[in-house]
Design a protein with these regions (language model features):
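Positively charged n-region of N-terminal signal peptides that target proteins for export
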Residues: 1-4, 180
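Sec-dependent N-terminal signal peptides
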Residues: 4-13
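C-terminal segment of classical bacterial N-terminal signal peptides
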Residues: 13-19
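Aromatic- and carboxylate-lined catalytic core of secreted/periplasmic carbohydrate-active enzymes
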Residues: 22-23, 49, 289-293, 299-302, ...
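Active-site mouth of glycoside hydrolases
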Residues: 25-264, 269
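Extracellular glycoside hydrolase catalytic/binding regions
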Residues: 171, 178, 195-353, 358-361, ...
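Solvent-exposed segments in extracellular or luminal domains encompassing
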Residues: 454-456
Length: 469
């Protein structure tokens, strides 16, 4: 019995020690996220260190216990980023027009305490309503602002176009500034979730963003300021995407896109990696020198009528895996951020995929490398390459084991053997110093021969190659 007690105490000590060892360093916790002056396509911390935002959306948590659960899971699996909506039941500070609920501010305080403890930088989304109409408040309806409920606005367009509407939005922003504007656990402030879904003409939306983005930046000089738009799944969305993402005060170019078999664009039914990579390619096509993120992604039923049924069988998190890897290896400032934190990640216990991405890029400094994304596809593989000054990173994705093949048709992913990828043309004659290969499905690194013509070990679905020169 004494031995059992001693062993139990020892295991508890080891567990606590490991948890403490994983606590973020003081410099990370005290640093703000910035756009890097050295390479403005990537983020850095105010202490000069590179920052790659690894995480997901945790937009609508139901309780304080959920906050502890999700942030703890993220921390233990290598994440350092999360996106939270401030107009949900848990955090909405104004359920009645003109009255601030201080209890909700205390909850936000608690969220940031947890974020600080776990090393998670939080992107706060300030608004997400699409309508102002009679009734009760919902995530997409701000009924308390309607004239029938004592508010000053006839509809959402009235709010967007009027001086009173701007004043009300900035009043809300200043409440958050007073309390959180100097908090380093804040990644940044997103003005609106998918603002092109608001019930207002597009020209009014454009004018509002031109006015408000710089004003919000003045209020939050220490934090990033950005905007988001609805899923890029139809031709009509391209003009507003280009307009909003080109605005200089919009510091982070963001795109939302999902696997959606009801979407107008065929790419939304393509393999997940192709869908995600193409979304970043659209942003890169604007010639921007700012960080780019696939800020919402995943798989949905046709026309966003619910989570896609493939999540129920995706026990290995292959959708999450592709959403994480494809954007970064296509030139984004970080991995993609899945939307379905509750319907997929937590239900299927696939948090570990974030840690696998973090391990794949561990020690990589995008600011030093000046990465340029290129493709080096070969038979049976889509090969996404980041070519840097000192390092070449490549994510090699099996072309056969797609979501349709493995998850819809239930055909297991096959183990691939004898594949090679020749990176010689990408190295410009530089001498190879080291080659390592990472299998994210086994969480294993292996050394390979010091040559640019790389023979891949047997693997399933995907593998990462790192060449140092």
């Amino acid at each position: 019995m004494k031995r059992l007690i001693l062993l139990t105490c020892l295991l508890a000590f080891v567990s606590v020690t490991e948890a403490w060892a994983k606590r973020p360093g003081r410099s990370f916790r005290r640093s703000f996220v910035q756009v890097s002056a050295r390479d403005p396509r990537y983020f850095c911390l105010s202490d000069g260190q590179p920052y790659i935002p690894v995480g997901c959306n945790i937009a609508a948590m139901g309780s304080v216990a959920d906050m502890e659960h999700y942030l703890g899971k993220m921390h233990r699996n290598g994440a350092n980023f999360g996106r939270v909506w401030l107009n949900t039941n848990l955090f909405e500070i104004e359920t009645r027009y003109g009255e601030v609920d201080t209890a909700k501010l205390v909850r936000i305080d608690r969220l940031l305490e947890l974020a600080d403890r776990y090393g998670i930088k939080i992107k706060f989304c300030i608004e997400s309503f699409r309508h102002i109409r009679p009734g009760v408040n919902k995530w997409d309806t701000k009924a308390s602002y309607h004239t029938s409920n004592g508010g000053p606005f006839a509809d959402a367009d009235d709010y967007i176009t009027s001086q009173r509407g701007e004043e009300e939005f900035l009043r809300r922003v200043r409440i958050f500034r007073e309390r959180y504007g100097d908090h380093p656990a804040v990644f940044g402030w997103e003005l609106w979730n998918e603002m092109n879904a608001v019930e207002t003409p597009e020209e009014h939306l454009r004018a509002w963003n031109v006015r408000m983005l710089p004003r919000v930046k003045e209020i939050f000089p220490k934090n990033l300021v950005m905007q988001s738009l609805g899923s890029l799944d139809r031709e009509s969305s391209f003009p507003i995407y280009e307009f909003i993402n080109r605005l200089p005060p919009n510091e982070v170019a963001q795109v939302h896109r999902y696997i959606d078999e009801g979407a107008e664009l065929a790419v939304c039914g393509a393999p997940v990696d192709s869908m995600a990579s193409d979304a970043i390619a659209v942003l890169r096509g604007y010639g921007l020198r700012k960080p780019m993120l696939l800020a919402e992604s995943g798989a949905v039923k046709p026309v966003h009528t619910g989570p896609h049924p493939i999540y129920k069988v995706d026990t290995m998190g292959s959708v999450l895996h592709d959403v994480l890897f494809a954007p970064f290896f296509s030139g984004a400032a970080g991995p993609g951020h899945l939307w379905h934190w509750d319907h997929h990640i937590d239900k299927q216990h696939t948090w570990f995929q974030m840690g696998r991405f973090a391990r794949a890029v561990e020690g990589v400094d995008p600011l030093r490398e000046g990465f340029e994304p290129v493709r080096r596809d070969t038979a049976g593989l889509r090969v996404y390459v980041l070519r840097g000054e000192h390092t070449l990173l490549a994510w090699c994705r099996d072309t056969v084991s797609t979501w349709r093949h493995e998850l819809s048709e239930r055909i297991p992913a096959q183990r691939l053997s004898g594949l090679q990828v020749d990176f010689t043309p990408l190295l410009g004659g530089r001498r190879v110093k080291k080659v390592r290969i990472y299998d994210p499905w086994r969480d294993e690194w292996v050394r390979a021969s010091r040559r640019a013509d790389v023979s891949l070990p047997d693997f399933t679905r995907s593998v990462v190659v790192r060449i140092e020169y």
